[in-house]
Amino acid sequence: MKICVTSKGAGTDSLVEERFGRAPYFVFVDSGSGESVTIENPLLNESGGVGPRIVQLIVKEGADVVITGQLGGNATTTLQASGAKVFAYGDNGTVADAVAKFKEGKLRQLI
């Protein structure tokens, strides 16, 4: 399973970013191997409506699960249509911590 976590920095030791569409980075973690790949947000400086376009990026990368803090309305609708599951993380911890809590079933499912 591939997990995408919105992040303030590159890598699993970076802090989780609460804002979905405005996250500077997206860290994709393979839940089996633990390997990760970080993608910089190409739409970070765009004006409005980036949420659905970010969803397209995440789906293209093959994410089954998204962990983030907050979602806008358009991103929520697009994520629902994509079939990805979305979980809330608001503990100001690292990407690695968010993934661990997801695996333990300790995150609240949003979608």
Question: Across the structure, where does each feature detected by a protein language model lie?
Answer:
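N-terminal first-folded block
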Residues: 2-43
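Domain-level signature for proteins that mediate thiol-based redox and metal-cofactor handling
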Residues: 7, 14-17, 65, 80-81, ...
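Short secondary-structure boundary segments
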Residues: 7-9, 69-70, 90-91
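Short, well-ordered secondary-structure micro-motifs
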Residues: 14-18, 49, 78, 99
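Compact, charge-rich alpha-helical regulatory domains located at protein termini
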Residues: 36-67, 91-93, 108
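A short, charged
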Residues: 62-78
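C-terminal structural segments of small proteins and small subunits
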Residues: 73-111
